[in-house]
Amino acid sequence: MNECEPCSGAFAEPTLADLTQYRRDLHQIPEVDFDLPKTIAYVHSVIDELPCEVFEPCRSTVCAFFDRGSEHTTAIRTDTDALPVTEKSGVPFCSTHAGHMDACGHDGHMAMALGLARHIAAHLDELDRSVLIVFQPAEETTGGAQFICESGTFEKYHVDRIFGFHLWPDLPKGHIASRPGALLAATSESTFTFFGKATHIAKAEDGADSMEAGMRFILEAYDYMAQRAHEEPCTFKCGLLQSGQARNVISSRTYI
């Protein structure tokens, strides 16, 4: 925990070069789910020097509280985990962790949050409310946000507003965008298993083709979603299909 007295002007504004360095440093050390030791250490290396209370309310979560003595606090949330993806970009700051990559922009999100923390430190005396910056793990997987919500942090620090953000490459440089209501979709992941009966393809009539059943399910589900696309903004897609063990044997089990 780091507790410092507010001292506006004693801390330098972050530069674009600083933010670029943060992003590239973090891009090289992608970690997934709650297993984020290097990422957490990097976040601490920046915010521990600032006039804020630094604490970890739950597993792999780092918070920085800039106290203005107000009963009102604005929270800013960034995600910190990467994806189980192999990077092949060839850039000088490419991932050094095999099989892991910041492919969804969380390195950029963290860089912006660290830059914001330094900006707040430089202008702390000018704020009329406190600020809590939250570095959240497991956004891509098991739901790190739930543990933060259940920790009592938002109640303890009187959070009455919270903002998240996401990089959007289609926006012009220097622009941000929002809209009333829902903006980004929540996701639910499902696994479907189809059971059949394996037989030699020459005797296909004696078997039950789980692969055909799975493919028909996908096509009919896609057709159904297309028919109701005008009713609500939602989508259904399958990204993985595993079936069969031999070319000449009817598949007895299919996973989607």
Language model segments and positions:
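Acidic/His- and Gly-rich active-site-bordering loop/insert found
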Residues: N2-D102, D107, A111, G115-L127
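Histidine/acidic-residue-rich, glycine-tolerant segments that coordinate divalent metal ions
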Residues: L83, V91-M101, G108, D125-S252
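A glycine- and small/hydrophobic-rich beta-loop-beta segment
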Residues: Y255
